[in-house]
Amino acid sequence: MVKGGNGSRKRKGDRFELAVVKDQERIGRWAAKLRQGGGEVVDIVSIEKCQDGRCTAHSHVSHVWLIQAKVGGYMNPVERERLVMEAQAISATPLMAWKDKGIQYKDIS
């Protein structure tokens, strides 16, 4: 029996994505893990009520982050470009999340 294959890696990735959602909620944002399946580049959407008044949508004020969670901390250039394009299309901020003594975030715009 082979251990540590794609199934194990997927479960590890799923657990990390849920940890990122919980971390986003901890810092005061609403967050949701997206259903995956068609090669989607966005793993998590996170929204925070805007405190600086720089953005409005239907008289609601918020900031939006599109997050790609990478357990190993590496995002290939194609994924990076796709995430940036998705974020630009809706005026969101693209973030990569990775694990290094807790959850770290990097704005990749």
Model-predicted regions and their roles:
Residues M1-S109:
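Catalytic phosphate/metal-binding cores of nucleic-acid and nucleotide-processing enzymes, i.e., regions
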